[in-house]
From Swiss-Prot:
Protein name per UniProt: Ice nucleation protein
Domain of life assignment: Bacteria
GO terms under cellular component: cell outer membrane
Keywords, comma-separated and alphabetical: Cell outer membrane, Ice nucleation, Membrane, Repeat
Cellular compartments annotated: Cell outer membrane
Gene transcribed to yield this protein: inaK
Lineage: Bacteria, Pseudomonadati, Pseudomonadota, Gammaproteobacteria, Pseudomonadales
Length: 1148
């Protein structure tokens, strides 16, 4: 039989909640909602397998609930603590105390069949971790045990054995100490100590300690300590400590600490700490901390912290923190934080934060934050934030933010934001935003935005936006927008828009739009639009539109439209439309339309349409249509159509048709059709159609269509279509389409499409599309697309796309894409992409991508990517990537990556990575990585890594790493590492390490380590270490170590060690050690030791005070013994150097 279930023991709080807040059932299934199969305590249910193991996770509280649950063995995961297991789900089979749970598990261990289930179809296999399993009486439980247990070991077997039968208390021997004076009543359980004055009443549980004055009443659970003065009443659960002066009343749950002055009342749940002065009343839930001076009243939920000065009142929900000075009153919901100085009154909902100076009043809903100086009053709904300096008064609805200077008053509805300087008054409805400097007064309805300078007054209805400079006065209805500079006065109805310069006066009805320069006066009825430059006076009825230049005077009835240049005078009845150039005079009845260029004089009846060129005079009745050229005089009645030839004056009303010959001047209202001959000037209103021969001048309103011959000039409003012949000039508004032949000049508004022939000049607004022929000049706004043939000049705004032919010059804003032909010059802003053929010059901003052909020059900002053809010159900022063919010159900032072909010159900042072909010249800052081909010259700063082909020259700073192939020359600073191929020359500073191939020459500072191939020549300073192959030459200073192969020449200073192979020559100074192979020659000075192979010559150079003399010895058959170290003794005899304690042998 296979056991597939086990029993697990755990504890919960008295309410059946575990440490994670999960409420366990009294019986039935319990499951973790966030199960994770890991060997950690979180994300699962845990307990002691079969009730044996560490006691660290069992509750020590007397009212803890001991739970036994049944768990499938396959679900169990062992944890690191002895006996602890983790599982996703369980079946609760028993709930009781420690003894009953222990008896339950012990009984089931004796009868394992009660917790196992047999199956005839399959056998359940436990998880890979070892799970102890209960066995019959002959089996024992095996638990993982730590080497050193950090907690007591709990075992249900020992508990059951020591306990009485189930449902009985353990047997203990009563040990009580009771001391009382007369008139007292004492009752204590086991191990209790009761001491009381006369007339007292004390009742204690196990292990309690009660001390009371006369007339006191004390009741405590087991393990408690109570001390009180006379006439006090103390009641506490087990494990509590209570201390009270006379006349106090303390009540607390288990594990609490209460300290009270005289005549105080303390009530707290379990685990609380209360400290109070005399005449205080403290009430708190479990786990709370309360501290109060005398005369204070504190009430808080569980887990709260309250600190109060003298005569203060604090009320807070659970988990709150309250701190107050004397004479303060604080009230807060759960989870709140309140801090107040003396004399303050704070009231807040749950989760709020309140900080107040002295004598302040704060009231806020839940989740609010309030901060105030002294003598301030703040009131806010839930979720609000209020900050005020001293002497301020703030009132706001829920979710609002208020910030005020000294002595300010802010009132706002919910969700509002208010910011003000000192001495300001702000009032706003809900969802509003107000910002004001000192001395300002703002009043706005809900959803409004108000911004004011110093000493300004703003009044607006709901949903309005007001912005003003200092000393301004703005008044607007709801949904209005007003913007004014200093010293201005604006008054508008609801839904209006007003913009004014300094010292201006604007008055408008609701739904109006007013824009003026400085020192202007605008008056309009509701629904009007007025635009004026400085020094103008505009007056209109409701629903009117007026536009005026500087120093103009416009007067119109309601529903009128007036447009005038500077120094113009316009008078019209209601519903009229007037458009005039500067210094014009227009007079019309109601419902009329007048259009005139500068210097014209127009008079028309109501419902008429008059269109005139400059210097013309038109008079027409109502409903007329007039069209005339400049310097013409056209007069027409209502509903008329006028057509004039060159140099004519035509005046027509709306919807008219005018036809004029060459050199004519035609003016027409909206929707007109005009046809003129050679050298004509045509002017038309919105939606007009104009056709003219060569050298004509055409002006059209929005949505017009214009067609002109050779050398024409066309001007059109928004959405116009213009077609012109050779050498034409076209001007169009937004969304226009223009088509012109060669040598044309085109100007368009936003979203326009322009097509021009050879040598054309095009200018366009945002989002335009321009196409031009050879040698064209194109200028476009943001998001434009330009296409031009060779030798074109293109200028575009942000996000533009430019395509140009051979030898073109392109300039673009941010994020542009430019493509140009051969020998082009491209300039672009940040994030641009440029593509050009050979011999191009490209300049880009940060983060740009540039691609150029042969022999190009590229300049880019930070983080750019550049790719260029043969013989290119590239310059880039930090973090750039450059790629060029051989023969190129590259310059890059810090952290750049440059790749170039043969014969290139690369210069980079710190931390750069340079890669180049043969015959290249590379220069880099500190920490750079350089890789070059044959015959390259590399120069780098400190800490650089250089790699080059053969015959290269490398120069590096301190701590550099250089690698070069055959025939290279390397120069490095101190502490460098150099590696070179055959026939290389290396020069390094002190302490350097050099490695070279065959026939290399190495020069290093003192203390260097040199390693070279055969026939190498090594030169180093003092304290050096040199190693070389056969046929090498080594030269070093004092205290050096030299090693070489056969047929080598070694020269060293004093105190050196020289070792070489056969047929070598070794020369050293005093006190040196020389060792060589056969057929070698060794020369040493005083104190030196020489050792050589067969047929070698040993020469000792000695100084006798006047001259040098030599002692010579030869090794071999007729000489001294080979491979023995020899030196010159005090008698100037050559002797072999003995080992310690050996006799020395004189050599004759």
């Amino acid at each position: 039989m296979t056991l597939d279930k086990a029993l697990v023991l755990r504890t919960c709080a008295n309410n059946m909640a575990d440490h994670c807040g999960l409420i366990w059932p009294a019986s039935g299934t319990v499951e973790s909602r966030y199960w994770q199969s890991t060997r950690r305590h979180e994300n699962g249910l845990v307990g002691l397998l079969w009730g044996a193991g560490t006691s660290a996770f069992l509750s020590v509280h007397a009212d803890a609930r001991w739970i036994v649950c049944e768990v499938a063995v396959a679900d169990i995961i062992s944890l690191e603590e002895p006996g602890m297991v983790k599982f996703p789900r369980a079946e609760v089979v028993h709930v009781g105390d420690r003894i009953s749970a222990s008896h339950f598990i012990s009984a089931r261990q004796a009868d394992p069949a009660s917790t196992s289930t047999s199956t005839s179809t399959s056998t359940l296999t436990p998880m890979p971790t070892a799970i102890p399993t209960p066995m019959p009486a002959v089996a024992s439980v095996t638990l993982p045990v730590a080497e050193q247990a950090r907690h007591e070991v709990f075992d249900v077997a020992s508990v059951s054995a020591a306990a009485a039968p189930v449902n009985t208390l353990p047997v203990t021997t009563p040990q009580n100490l009771q001391t009382a004076t007369y008139g007292s009543t004492l009752s204590g359980d086991n191990h209790s100590r009761l001491i009381a004055g006369y007339g007292s009443n004390e009742t204690a549980g196990n292990h309690s300690d009660l001390i009371a004055g006369y007339g006191s009443t004390g009741t405590a659970g087991y393990g408690s300590t109570q001390t009180s003065g006379e006439d006090s009443s103390l009641t506490a659960g087990y494990g509590s400590t209570q201390t009270a002066q006379e006349g106090s009343n303390l009540t607390a749950g288990y594990g609490s600490t209460g300290t009270a002055g005289s005549d105080s009342s303390l009530i707290a749940g379990y685990g609380s700490t209360q400290t109070s002065g005399g005449d205080s009343s403290l009430t708190a839930g479990y786990g709370s901390t309360q501290t109060a001076q005398e005369g204070s009243n504190l009430t808080a939920g569980y887990g709260s912290t309250g600190t109060a000065g003298v005569d203060s009142s604090l009320i807070a929900g659970y988990g709150s923190t309250q701190t107050s000075g004397s004479d303060s009153a604080l009230t807060a919901g759960y989870g709140s934080t309140q801090t107040a100085q003396e004399g303050s009154n704070l009231t807040a909902g749950y989760g709020s934060t309140g900080t107040a100076g002295s004598d302040s009043s704060l009231i806020a809903g839940y989740g609010s934050t309030q901060t105030s100086g002294s003598d301030s009053s703040l009131t806010a709904g839930y979720g609000s934030t209020q900050t005020a300096q001293e002497g301020s008064n703030l009132t706001a609805g829920y979710g609002s933010t208020g910030t005020a200077g000294v002595d300010s008053s802010l009132i706002a509805g919910y969700g509002s934001t208010q910011t003000s300087g000192s001495d300001s008054a702000l009032t706003a409805g809900y969802g509003s935003t107000q910002t004001a400097q000192e001395g300002s007064n703002l009043t706005a309805g809900y959803g409004s935005t108000g911004t004011a300078g110093a000493d300004s007054s703003l009044i607006a209805g709901y949903g309005s936006t007001q912005t003003s400079g200092s000393e301004s006065s703005l008044t607007a209805g709801y949904g209005s927008t007003q913007t004014a500079r200093e010293g201005s006065t604006l008054t508008a109805g609801y839904g209006s828009t007003g913009t004014a310069g300094a010292d201006s006066s604007l008055i408008a009805g609701y739904g109006s739009t007013q824009t003026s320069g400085s020192e202007s006066s605008l008056t309009a009825g509701y629904g009007s639009t007025q635009t004026a430059q400085q020094g103008s006076v505009l007056t209109s009825g409701y629903g009117s539109t007026q536009t005026a230049g500087a120093a103009s005077n416009l007067t119109t009835g309601y529903g009128s439209t007036g447009t005038a240049g500077h120094e113009s005078f316009i008078i019209a009845g209601y519903g009229s439309t007037q458009t005039a150039g500067h210094k014009s005079i227009l007079t019309a009845g109601y419902g009329s339309t007048q259009t005139a260029r500068d210097g014209s004089y127009l008079i028309a009846g109501y419902g008429s349409t008059g269109t005139a060129g400059s210097g013309s005079s038109l008079i027409a009745g109502y409903g007329s249509t007039q069209t005339a050229s400049y310097r013409s005089m056209l007069t027409a009645g209502y509903g008329s159509t006028q057509t004039a030839r060159e140099h004519s004056d035509l005046v027509t009303g709306y919807g008219s048709t005018s036809t004029a010959g060459s050199n004519s001047s035609l003016i027409a209202g909206y929707g007109s059709t005009q046809t003129a001959g050679f050298k004509s000037i045509l002017t038309a209103g919105y939606g007009s159609t104009q056709t003219a021969q060569e050298r004509s001048d055409l002006v059209a309103g929005y949505g017009s269509t214009s067609t002109a011959g050779y050398s024409s000039s066309l001007i059109a409003g928004y959405g116009s279509t213009q077609t012109a012949g050779y050498e034409s000039t076209l001007t169009a508004g937004y969304g226009s389409t223009q088509t012109a032949q060669e040598n044309s000049s085109l100007t368009t508004g936003y979203g326009s499409t322009s097509t021009a022939g050879y040598s054309s000049s095009l200018i366009a607004g945002y989002g335009s599309t321009q196409t031009a022929g050879y040698e064209s000049t194109l200028t476009a706004g943001y998001g434009s697309t330009q296409t031009a043939q060779e030798r074109s000049d293109l200028v575009t705004g942000y996000g533009s796309t430019s395509t140009a032919g051979y030898a073109s010059s392109l300039i673009a804003g941010y994020g542009s894409t430019q493509t140009a032909g051969y020998e082009s010059t491209l300039t672009a802003g940040y994030g641009s992409t440029q593509t050009a053929q050979e011999n191009s010059s490209l300049t880009t901003g940060y983060g740009s991508t540039s691609t150029a052909g042969f022999a190009s020059s590229l300049i880019a900002g930070y983080g750019s990517t550049q790719t260029a053809g043969y013989k290119s010159t590239l310059t880039a900022g930090y973090g750039s990537t450059q790629t060029a063919e051989y023969g190129s010159s590259l310059t890059a900032g810090y952290g750049s990556t440059a790749t170039a072909g043969q014969d290139s010159s690369l210069i980079a900042g710190y931390g750069s990575s340079l890669t180049s072909g043969i015959r290249s010249f590379l220069t880099a800052g500190y920490g750079s990585t350089l890789i070059a081909g044959l015959r390259s010259v590399l120069i780098a700063g400190y800490g650089s890594s250089l790699t080059s082909g053969i015959r290269s020259t490398l120069t590096a700073g301190y701590g550099s790493n250089q690698i070069a192939s055959y025939g290279s020359s390397l120069i490095a600073g101190h502490e460098s590492i150099q590696v070179a191929g055959n026939k290389s020359m290396l020069i390094a500073g002190k302490g350097s390490s050099q490695t070279a191939g065959f026939r290399s020459t190495l020069i290093a500072g003192a203390g260097s380590v040199q390693l070279a191939g055969d026939r190498s020549r090594l030169i180093a300073g003092a304290d050096s270490n040199q190693t070389a192959g056969d046929r090498s030459k080594l030269l070093a200073g004092n205290n050096s170590y030299l090693t070489a192969g056969d047929r080598s020449k070694l020269t060293g200073g004093h105190d050196c060690t020289l070792m070489a192979g056969d047929q070598s020559r070794l020369t050293a100074g005093k006190n040196s050690v020389l060792t060589a192979g056969a057929r070698s020659k060794l020369i040493g000075s005083e104190g030196s030791t020489l050792s050589a192979g067969e047929d070698s010559t040993l020469i000792f150079r000695l100084w006798d005070g006047k001259r040098y003399r030599q002692l010579v010895a030869r090794t071999g058959e007729n000489g001294v013994e080979a491979d023995i170290p020899y030196y010159v003794n005090e008698d100037d005899d050559i002797v072999d150097k003995p080992d310690e304690d050996d006799d020395w042998i004189e050599v004759k």
